[in-house]
Amino acid sequence: MKNINPTQTAAWQALQKHFDEMKDVTIADLFAKDGDRFSKFSATFGDQMLVDYSKNRITEETLAKLQDLAKECDLAGAIKSMFSGEKINRTENRAVLHVALRNRSNTPILVDGKDVMPEVNAVLEKMKTFSEAIISGEWKGYTGKAITDVVNIGIGGSDLGPYMVTEALRPYKNHLNMHFVSNVDGTHIAEVLKKVNPETTLFLVASKTFTTQETMTNAHSARDWFLKAAGDEKHVAKHFAALSTNAKAVGEFGIDTANMFEFWDWVGGRYSLWSAIGLSIVLSIGFDNFVELLSGAHAMDKHFSTTPAEKNLPVLLALIGIWYNNFFGAETEAILPYDQYMHRFAAYFQQGNMESNGKYVDRNGNVVDYQTGPIIWGEPGTNGQHAFYQLIHQGTKMVPCDFIAPAITHNPLSDHHQKLLSNFFAQTEALAFGKSREVVEQEYRDQGKDPATLDYVVPFKVFEGNRPTNSILLREITPFSLGALIALYEHKIFTQGVILNIFTFDQWGVELGKQLANRILPELKDDKEISSHDSSTNGLINRYKAWRG
């Protein structure tokens, strides 16, 4: 993978000139000049997904110049490097092969000359056998009762992905009740334990090293709670399984290593839902539906790795994102799913994007002088419309938005879905085209309003428009289409990282806080006044000690 400063390319310089020409062009102008704009700036993925990127401040020339940037930064070579098992995560000397986890074609993928697919398939088969025993009731707890509840204990990628997917695919869930515990705040585990019965609960402890502070603190609390009821430590093996590679620590915890599900160092945490970390997904929706999830992602992998940049959906979305982030100065992107089951999708890709591309040092080790990852946030529609859309419509920040919705709902109650989708369509239209002063004035005149009131109120009712959006319309949210959608965003993030010349698959930014917390923890064990930090941190710790009693 080449290390190219994007700002030093001819394409970047051309884009800077092009931006000067485009900065005052409106989306309304672009539509007025081209009646075929939708057909030119939208694309389908099979019969599952329509991506409409026509309501953006782009022309065919913009896209051509952005694609030139991708070529100069050797995006094609980087894609090949990832899919072939090259160790593109150089700061950790690791391959990046979440694509191997969903490689349904089973074509060999090599790491250090060894095909990883036999091991991937072996773990999948083990997940299948285990999950079928739990779901069928064949697996019994220590009192002979079947499992009714599953508690996944993990954090970051070991929590966000499985939680997001099990929520998004709730229409496919079986009788098992799923719970997720991540926060080291004791409230999180305490509230979940109030809801479950030790005789019928299975705990999944998701930690590659089996040393993650938050996860192991929660796991030991769950174990203590369980043993208060079960008594004998030998019963732990019937109620705990591990998603880990540390067989020694897993065995010492009391878990039968036969119920330890492995994954590999080429699986990054925020890309791990496709691995053994997805066992909670399998237990929720069944193995066959999990395979459909993998198949949808694999289909997008094939699209990404074989489709030219001009028609490549992850590449197009990535390039448009760079256009706004680096030329228009937009610092943020909103992900707005119009589907309540998808309520954790934005949070999942908040980690996926910000932990991947939130870097200020390039692949050469130099501090960058351009923008890297955007701030990602969002909530489901229509809730967001009554919360933060005001700023998107009439604020001073540019917030490019992705609107996501299914054409077919899993809950066809009355006309709920038509009302939901009418808002989905209306919002992107309103953001793009706005509402002029002339229209507002005419509305007031038609209502017979007092002219003095009109002059005062009109400025507040004007919508400038020209706010960019993408619309992603799914036929229906199924395991297959969700898998494809997740992979679409994963590859968008990778594409941006390649072009921005940063390492997307490490996350050193999480380390310093952990190191300092480990230093502070012993200082909280007693009531002695602390003076070993800066005055602010000392003051906070000492007030905490005074107040805790």
Swiss-Prot record:
Keyword Isomerase: yes
Keywords: Acetylation, Cytoplasm, Gluconeogenesis, Glycolysis, Isomerase
One Pfam family from the record: PGI
Sites of N6-acetyllysine modification: K80, K228, K234
Localization of this protein: Cytoplasm
Functional pathway: Carbohydrate biosynthesis; gluconeogenesis; Carbohydrate degradation; glycolysis; D-glyceraldehyde 3-phosphate and glycerone phosphate from D-glucose: step 2/4
Function: Catalyzes the reversible isomerization of glucose-6-phosphate to fructose-6-phosphate.
Protein name (Swiss-Prot/TrEMBL): Glucose-6-phosphate isomerase
Source species: Escherichia coli O139:H28 (strain E24377A / ETEC)
